[in-house]
């Protein structure tokens, strides 16, 4: 839902949405300043292995999910960053690095520079 996201952003919070490429395109249309991170599997075989390890899906569902993952990969070029999900700790560190970099962008702090020095940061 859009309203809680907008409220959190207005409060200065960062928001993480787990959505597919189509959802990401809708967010980008509504909020061009949104930062998009595409989570890549270490390999296509890793996706299948992970799904089989869970032992919760039928063969048909596993094959459908693998095919969907391939389709999603076709859209990774529309994202700002790529994170490879081969290790949870490493993926977390990559997300953290993106967050820190984005929060420190000069463009996000123009008013601070102006207040500090009485000049434009541009």
Region locations from a protein language model:
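Residue-level signature of catalytic and energy-coupling elements of molecular machines
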Residues: 16, 69, 83
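An acidic, carboxylate-rich microenvironment
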Residues: 46, 60-61, 90
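ATP-dependent NMP and nucleoside kinases share a basic, alpha-helical "lid"
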Residues: 1-56, 73
């Amino acid at each position: 839902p859009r309203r809680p996201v907008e409220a959190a952003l207005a409060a200065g919070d960062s928001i993480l949405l787990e959505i597919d490429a189509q959802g990401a395109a809708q967010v980008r249309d509504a909020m061009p300043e949104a930062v998009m991170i595409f989570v890549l599997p270490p390999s296509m075989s890793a996706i299948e292995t992970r799904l089989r390890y869970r032992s919760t899906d039928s063969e048909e569902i596993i094959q459908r999910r693998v095919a969907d993952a391939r389709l999603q990969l076709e859209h990774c070029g529309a994202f700002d960053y790529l994170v490879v999900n081969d290790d949870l700790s490493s993926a977390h560190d990559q997300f953290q690095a993106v967050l820190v970099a984005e929060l420190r962008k000069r463009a996000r702090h123009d008013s601070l520079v102006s207040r500090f020095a009485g000049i434009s940061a541009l």
